[in-house]
A protein has these predicted regions:
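Beta-strand-rich modules
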Residues: 62-85
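Recognizes extended acidic, P/S/T-rich segments that occur
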Residues: 36-68
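Feature marks extracellular polysaccharide-active and adherence modules
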Residues: 141, 162-167, 174, 196-201, ...
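Pro/Thr/Ser/Gly-rich low-complexity, intrinsically disordered linker/stalk tracts
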Residues: 1-31, 83-98
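N-terminal extracellular ligand-recognition/capping segment immediately after the signal peptide
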Residues: 101-104, 108-160, 166-178
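Predominantly polar beta-repeat domains that present long G/T/S/D/N-rich surfaces used to bind, process
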Residues: 101, 229, 240-260
Length: 260
């Protein structure tokens, strides 16, 4: 039987500014007899097969990329050996090349649950990582991102969520929460988190205000700015004698409901 080919990695992307063509380059994969080239309109959009090349080729020029935006072209390469397919490469795009692995840029073509899964996966790494080295940013292009089964985007240390629209009305997000980094709901160490320039949409009837609220339970170095908040806002994580919070800087924000 055929050996399963190794996973490859896309290492480079270049765009021809005259023709718009985009050229990707990848690493040779052990046991690969050919490579399938896939393209999507976003990191978490639907990847479709656009071409297949032989194993002696480790670059591909897409002469007909999506032209609605040069940035709406994300690529994956799959190594193939006969009827045995290898694991897909990680996605690559002009945005990833420009901003690096720890900045995620989303657009309206992306699967909304996949976005939630990634944001909350990163939160799992960052929740208690007060002295860690990793930094993350999630940038949302104009669109509505509320159609997700996730309760909210949870954000921890060294994480930024930002809308890329001209106004906060251009990006609609379901909800954001900052779970306490210390015991007893104490958020006095919830530092170094930032949210800005989007709408927090009211998608529930608001009857369970404690769970439905925008929870900006933070300490210093945690700005929330230029938001349009349709939900009730809570500035603490939970009730209790030791459930301390120390504010959090909020500016240039419109609240449609109670804050406290």
């Amino acid at each position: 039987s055929m050996s399963k080919p190794a996973k490859t990695d896309i290492t480079d992307i270049k765009r021809d500014d005259k023709t718009g063509a985009q050229t990707i380059t990848w690493k040779v994969a052990t046991n690969a007899a050919s490579y399938n080239i896939y393209r999507a309109e976003g990191r978490y959009a639907e990847y479709k097969l656009i071409d297949t090349v032989k194993a002696d080729q480790t670059s591909y020029t897409d002469t007909k990329p999506n032209t609605s935006s040069k940035y709406k072209n994300y690529y994956k390469v799959e190594s193939v050996n006969g009827n045995v397919n290898g694991e897909m490469s990680e996605p690559y795009s002009l945005e990833i090349a420009q901003f690096g692995d720890n900045m995620y840029v989303f657009n309206d073509a992306d699967d909304k649950d996949a976005i939630s899964d990634k944001v909350n996966e990163i939160f799992g790494y960052q929740h208690y990582d007060q002295f860690g080295q990793n930094r993350y940013a999630f940038a949302f292009k104009p669109g509505d991102y509320t159609d997700t089964s996730a309760d909210a985007y949870n954000v921890g240390y060294y994480t930024q969520i930002l809308g890329l629209g001209k106004t906060p009305y251009d990006v609609r997000i379901k909800n954001v929460k900052t779970p306490a980094a210390l015991a007893n709901g104490n958020v006095t160490c919830n530092f170094w988190v930032d949210v800005e320039n989007f709408t927090i949409a009211q998608t529930s009837d608001g009857s369970d205000y404690w769970n439905d609220s925008f929870k900006w339970a933070v300490s210093q170095a945690a700005p929330a700015r230029r938001l349009n908040v349709e939900r009730q806002t809570l500035l603490q994580w939970t009730w209790g004698d030791k459930a301390w919070a120390s504010g959090g800087y909020i500016s240039d924000t419109k609240f449609h409901d109670a804050v406290g």
